[in-house]
Amino acid sequence: MADQRQRSLSTSGESLYHVLGLDKNATTDDIKKCYRKLALKYHPDKNPDNPEASEKFKEINNAHGILADSTKRNIYDKYGSLGLYVAEQFGEENVNTYFVLSSWWAKALFMFCGLITGCYCCCCLCCCCNCCCGKCKPRPPEGEDQDIYVSPEDLEAQMQSDERDTEGPVLVQPASATETTQLTSDSHASYHTDGFN
C-alpha cells in the first residue's frame, strides 16, 4: 500500500462521469438512473465475497454524491477533481478566487508589483513611515501651522508654568449619600460657572 502511487488530481472533470457510464451533458435524472442501476449491481450485500465490488460501490457513491449536487457538479465540470479538493479546503465560494489568484498572470502581476516597489518595501514605508521617510509627505493646507519640533526641555518648562498659573487643588468634596438622601432633587443642578450664566 505504501508503494502505491497517490492518484493525481485531474483538471478535466470527466472520470466521475466514466464511473457512472455517462457523458458530461447527462441530466440529473440520467445520473440518478445510472447510479441506482450500478449501486444495485455492486452493493456489498449482494457481493459479500468480492472486495472489488465494495470498492466499486464506494466509487459509485462518491461519483453520485458529487454529480447529484449542482454546485459540486459545476465545480467538477469546470475544474475537475482539483476544483473539488480546493472547494473542500477553502470553501465552495472561494474556488474561482483560488484559480484566478493561482493563474500565471496573477502571479506575474504580484511579482511585478513586488519588483517595482522593492519587495513591497515602498508600500510599507508609505503606510508606516509617512511616505519615504517624510520626503513625499503631503503638505498641510495653506493657513495651517506646520508641525514644529518642540524639545523636551521646552515642553517641560511650559508644563511647569501652566501648573503655576492654576489655583490650588479643589478641597471641597460632595456630601456623602445616606439612606435619607433623595435620588432626585426638585431643584435643577446648574453646571455653569459664574462667568457663563
Curated annotation (Swiss-Prot):
<comment type="function">
    <text>May have an important role in presynaptic function. May be involved in calcium-dependent neurotransmitter release at nerve endings.</text>
</comment>
<dbReference type="GO" id="GO:0098793">
    <property type="term" value="C:presynapse"/>
</dbReference>
<dbReference type="Pfam" id="PF00226">
    <property type="entry name" value="DnaJ"/>
</dbReference>
<dbReference type="InterPro" id="IPR001623">
    <property type="entry name" value="DnaJ_domain"/>
</dbReference>
<feature type="compositionally biased region" description="Polar residues">
    <location>
        <begin position="175"/>
        <end position="197"/>
    </location>
</feature>
<feature type="region of interest" description="Disordered">
    <location>
        <begin position="153"/>
        <end position="197"/>
    </location>
</feature>
<dbReference type="GO" id="GO:0043231">
    <property type="term" value="C:intracellular membrane-bounded organelle"/>
</dbReference>
<dbReference type="InterPro" id="IPR036869">
    <property type="entry name" value="J_dom_sf"/>
</dbReference>
<keyword id="KW-0143">Chaperone</keyword>
<dbReference type="GO" id="GO:0042584">
    <property type="term" value="C:chromaffin granule membrane"/>
</dbReference>
<keyword id="KW-0472">Membrane</keyword>
<dbReference type="InterPro" id="IPR051434">
    <property type="entry name" value="DnaJ_C_subfamily_member5"/>
</dbReference>
<dbReference type="GO" id="GO:0098693">
    <property type="term" value="P:regulation of synaptic vesicle cycle"/>
</dbReference>
<feature type="domain" description="J">
    <location>
        <begin position="13"/>
        <end position="82"/>
    </location>
</feature>
<keyword id="KW-1003">Cell membrane</keyword>
<dbReference type="GO" id="GO:0005886">
    <property type="term" value="C:plasma membrane"/>
</dbReference>
<dbReference type="GO" id="GO:0061077">
    <property type="term" value="P:chaperone-mediated protein folding"/>
</dbReference>
<dbReference type="GO" id="GO:0016020">
    <property type="term" value="C:membrane"/>
</dbReference>
<keyword id="KW-0564">Palmitate</keyword>
<keyword id="KW-0968">Cytoplasmic vesicle</keyword>
<dbReference type="GO" id="GO:0005829">
    <property type="term" value="C:cytosol"/>
</dbReference>
<dbReference type="GO" id="GO:0042470">
    <property type="term" value="C:melanosome"/>
</dbReference>
<keyword id="KW-0963">Cytoplasm</keyword>
<protein>
    <recommendedName>
        <fullName>DnaJ homolog subfamily C member 5</fullName>
    </recommendedName>
</protein>
<keyword id="KW-0449">Lipoprotein</keyword>
